[in-house]
Amino acid sequence: MPVTDAIAQSLPIIAVSNLIKQFGRFAALRGVDAEFCVGKFYVILGDNGAGKTTLLRALAGLAHPTRGTISIQGKTPQEACRKIGYMAHPSLLYDEMSGIENLRYFARLYDIAGDERCEEVIRAVGLDPEMARAVGQYSQGMRQRMSLARAILHDPKILLLDEPFSNVDVHSAREMVGLLKGMRDAGKTILVVTHQAALLEGVADEFVWMQSGQIVERTREPGGEHSGAGTR
């Protein structure tokens, strides 16, 4: 029987079981259990130190669990790395290169030939691919947009974005939200760590609240029981 779009979007693309991550005696993640489904937009909220970034890094394959498992359609994050686009905070860009030079470098890692895709994603985030200025001379908002371009360059199925709207003006942030909404509508799974939940109200499918290394609440709206945390 064929899998319909509705059925596909109810299937988990990411499954996390009893995820623990310790740094010495400090437990950044304390037994996280969660599933994230195909084509859904999730916002991860919580105070600083709640474990949000550590969870995102673990899902991206950059923080190895002390205990527990992460399955991305039956594979580890490392095995599924080409399905994942990760935007770090602060950004992972080469300051001495221009934006297009940065993307050319990463395009080679993904076996993407030519400049067409690089130019496409730069325009998609509202920047000019002809801009010769080195990334080190960008404003913080421009760096964030170029970091998003890097994350979507290889057309991943999953986007893991850490504070994508930090230091971005409201108009540009709304443009970025519109781009992400379109990608979600096209079937991508998106997880965003942010302190700006209001930007994503009416766009996100679910708000995931973290506290002391655990997921403590999942809601359809940003005003959950723990809404005082991580939304400022």
Model-derived regions, located:
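Conserved ABC transporter NBD signature motif
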Residues: 68-80
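Catalytic Walker B motif of ABC-type/P-loop ATPase nucleotide-binding domains
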Residues: 159-162
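Helix-to-loop junction immediately C-terminal to a conserved catalytic motif
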Residues: 60
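Conserved ABC ATPase "signature" region
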Residues: 104, 115-130
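The feature captures the beta-strand-to-loop junction immediately N-terminal to the Walker
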Residues: 45-47
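H-loop/switch region of ABC-family ATPase nucleotide-binding domains
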Residues: 194-195
